[in-house]
Amino acid sequence: MLDFMDYIQLSFAEATHWNRDNSYSSLNTTAQSILDFSTPERLRVHLSSLSTPHFATSYTLGTVGLLDGSVSYLFSTVPFDNLPSGSASIPLRKISPGYRQVQAPATPIETWGWDSLLDGVSIPGLTNGSRPEPPIPKDEESIKESEAKRKATLLHASLHLPPPSTLYALFLRRISSNMQLSLAVCSTQGPPQSKSAPQASMLTQLSHDTGKYSNEYLFSTDNALFGWRGLWNFGPDPRYTRDVPPPLSLLSAGAEAYYSPISSLIGMSTGLRFTTLPAATEIPPSSSPSSTRTPISTFPYTLTLTLAPIVGSLSTTYSLRASPNLAFSSRFGFNVYSWESEMVAGCELWRRTKKSDSSSDDDLEWARRKMRMHDFGVSLPGSPASPLLEDPARPEGPVSSNAHTEAETSDSVIKLRIDQSWNVRLLWEGRVKELLVSAGVGLGPGSFSLSPSVSSASGSGSAQSGGGPGMSYWRGVGVSVLYSS
């Protein structure tokens, strides 16, 4: 489950129309949301509040052997007037990432109104030679809101205690409609008797997104590390195409490279991603003209392939959403130098307790549509009248008016993960009264070479102190409670 501050930062990206999918760092986000979730450690309590539309605070208290906690503050020039901030109204699918439906690439929206040398210049392929003019504010309140968006800036600081305390700080600013600057600082307090300055490092990241491709330039003061990440989307350029049918699928290729002149560190990786887009799983209304393209009636899925040639690592993932409330994912990794392999499988199941009269047939109708068991213009008996069923897993823009409905229908989610060593992680996240609760457990056998009968009895895991051969043990169990207002 995301922290409250992560939820605010996610809302900031949506409010400023920044496409998080069009980045090489998000290539495996769909599989990672299902396979790489973490379970809480012992007991942890989060108290958060969106005090004003521009300012948020968060306090965390945990017990992991000893008491620890953190204090966080966040300020944004973009107001969050209509953002659900109470733990009773936050959409669970927003704060608990699951199967991520990648959206089609789009041209960055001109909502800030910067002057450009290309304004008024006719570009071949565009129906309109000039960029759309931003709306003119009508009153003083609209002027302030327009000014805030023009200078979209986010400041975040978090102090982790007890000593040695660690300070995290983030400065995020939209330079233009397609560029974003991020400065992240981490400082750790030295030993009590040490007179040296606290260890600190800063990561600078400049992101450039055009819709067709994206570039990220990074520099870290830790060993003077330079980095670059890029992603290219195959298909038509959204900047020069207008009034075309939405694409059904998307193939993206990307790469990253790092170099440190101090430590002579070199890193490189490349990857591919193929995913279905929302248009591939939507069925047009029967009133639509027959001349339009017929979408592919299929289950949404995402395939990725990543390769790190220097270390000889190869990884593939396959994620599938079998219904609006059920998703599966698997990952296979292999190293050509050490012959080590990794196999991980996981799933997530969303549970609804408050349903409408017709919602009991929604999942069955949704699956039948995907398997081409009925025509586009004909509804099955007992199915909703509309041929388009609302997909609760589809990401939306800035939180809309149906956020409260989504929060009511998605009450809890169960996530399960298992790997080739029978390490098992089970996580439950849901809403209890006005609290967001996350409870998880990890299990493991005491030996890697256990017999199948013992492995099935012990359940999962790998060796750790306190677990001898043939003995099962708890890898960890914990509960996290979040309350926000």
Swiss-Prot record:
The keyword Transmembrane applies. It is a multi-pass membrane protein. GO terms for biological process: establishment of mitochondrion localization; mitochondrial genome maintenance; mitochondrial outer membrane translocase complex assembly; mitochondrion-endoplasmic reticulum membrane tethering; phospholipid transport; protein insertion into mitochondrial outer membrane. GO terms for cellular component: ERMES complex; SAM complex. It is found in: Mitochondrion outer membrane. Transmembrane segments: none annotated. It comes from the Eukaryota. Residues 136-145 have a biased composition (Basic and acidic residues). Its main location: mitochondrion. Residues 126-145, 384-407, 450-469 are annotated as: Disordered. Keywords: Membrane, Mitochondrion, Mitochondrion outer membrane, Transmembrane, Transmembrane beta strand. InterPro entries: Mdm10. Residues 450-463 have a biased composition (Low complexity). Belongs to the MDM10 family. Lacks alpha-helical transmembrane segments, suggesting that it resides in the membrane via beta-sheet conformations similar to those predicted for other outer membrane proteins and porin. Component of the ERMES/MDM complex, which serves as a molecular tether to connect the endoplasmic reticulum and mitochondria. Components of this complex are involved in the control of mitochondrial shape and protein biogenesis and may function in phospholipid exchange. mdm10 is involved in the late assembly steps of the general translocase of the mitochondrial outer membrane (TOM complex). Functions in the tom40-specific route of the assembly of outer membrane beta-barrel proteins, including the association of tom40 with the receptor tom22 and small TOM proteins. Component of the ER-mitochondria encounter structure (ERMES) or MDM complex, composed of mmm1, mdm10, mdm12 and mdm34. Associates with the mitochondrial outer membrane sorting assembly machinery SAM(core) complex. This is Mitochondrial distribution and morphology protein 10. It comes from Penicillium rubens (strain ATCC 28089 / DSM 1075 / NRRL 1951 / Wisconsin 54-1255) (Penicillium chrysogenum).
